[in-house]
Amino acid sequence: MDSQGPIILEKSIKIEEVIKIANTSIIDIVTKTVTPEIKAPYELVDVEYDKMGSDYILSILVDKEGGITVEDTSDLTNIISPLLDTIDPDPFPNQYMLEVSSPGLERPLKTADSLKAAVGSYINVSLYQAIDKVKVFQGDLLAFDGETLTIDYLDKTRHKIVNIPYQVVAKVRMAVKL
């Protein structure tokens, strides 16, 4: 502090935004650390770091052709856990539980390649910006050309087609058709 007193920030940041930024940094660091060590036949699908109740959970979602077994998750945990201990400086502000698991039926689709592979599948798409006043679409992915997702969805009782620019997509995951 100088003789003029404390500096007051003019722009306030919500604590939730700070936590989200910190979590993104942790996810990036963990992803860079574990990706080279998850070798074929396994595929790293996603890394998530969230607070559940009073606990922090680091989830590493891994898959392989035909699905992963409990033994696979155990083997991968034995590879990943020591790797996380080598990260310096330690990015984790609190103790956490490591969870290595399958992405399940509603697996996230994080890359353009995973979206191309999902053409013909039933998906859920969340948007940063609404299209026709809608921010979440659920339907069949008809096409993805790297720039636009084309989805056939049900609006009440009528099928509609929507073209969604990839840059407004916040999150995409597989969905279960009921």
Swiss-Prot record:
Main location: cytoplasm
Organism: Streptococcus pyogenes serotype M5 (strain Manfredo)
GO cellular component: cytosol
GO BP annotations, alphabetical order: ribosomal small subunit assembly; translation
Compartment(s): Cytoplasm
Keywords, sorted A to Z: Cytoplasm, Ribosome biogenesis
Record carries keyword Cytoplasm: yes
Protein name: Ribosome maturation factor RimP
Cytoplasm among keywords: yes
Any Pfam family hit: RimP_N
InterPro entries in the cross-refs: Ribosome_maturation_RimP, RimP_C, RimP_C_sf, RimP_N, RimP_N_sf
Lineage start: Bacteria, Bacillati, Bacillota, Bacilli, Lactobacillales
Purpose: Required for maturation of 30S ribosomal subunits.
Family: Belongs to the RimP family.
Coiled coil: none
NCBIfam families the UniProt entry points to: PRK00092.1-2
Superkingdom of the source species: Bacteria
